[in-house]
Swiss-Prot record:
CDD domains: Lumazine_synthase-I (cd09209). Keywords: Riboflavin biosynthesis, Transferase. Belongs to the DMRL synthase family. Catalyzes the formation of 6,7-dimethyl-8-ribityllumazine by condensation of 5-amino-6-(D-ribitylamino)uracil with 3,4-dihydroxy-2-butanone 4-phosphate. This is the penultimate step in the biosynthesis of riboflavin. GO terms for cellular component: cytosol; riboflavin synthase complex. The gene is ribH. This is 6,7-dimethyl-8-ribityllumazine synthase. It catalyses: (2S)-2-hydroxy-3-oxobutyl phosphate + 5-amino-6-(D-ribitylamino)uracil = 6,7-dimethyl-8-(1-D-ribityl)lumazine + phosphate + 2 H2O + H(+). 5-amino-6-(D-ribitylamino)uracil binds at residues 24, 62-64, 86-88, 119. The lineage of its organism: Bacteria, Bacillati, Cyanobacteriota, Cyanophyceae, Synechococcales.
Amino acid sequence: MMATYEGRYTDAQALRIAVVVARFNDLVTGKLLSGCLDCLARHGVDTSSNSDQLDVAWVPGAFELPIVTQTLALSGQYEVVITLGAVIRGDTPHFDVVVAEASKGIASVSRETGVPVIFGVLTTDTMQQALERAGIKSNLGWSYGLQALEMGSLMGVLRSATSAS
């Protein structure tokens, strides 16, 4: 019989979540974090300053996201890690290097640790595009929060199903 596995957006109180935020372009990343925390709170995650369920780590920029994400994922304390950043194209190839290394690094953390890592790094050509994605038109931080809830739940379902068989 075919099995179907899906994550849920309920029972979020059971998840331990880490959010790693790049400080560079904090006008954008601060808004992403706000949207993400709003989503998590509305789904039952304790986002208060004395929360035992959520931790937020700030890093200098998107390039530093993978190492801190890996450290948190390896700690065994979190069911899911969310990364938030904003890399905006400039006149030099720096954008391409940062985006490539950050995305590869973040993806490898998830594969190597088995902890879902949500890729919440905006890659845009202009600051205006980044701001539109961080709150002017919509806030993708909310979407990243939902992805974290779904993946954290799904991994729990999969672990239970595979350990039972």
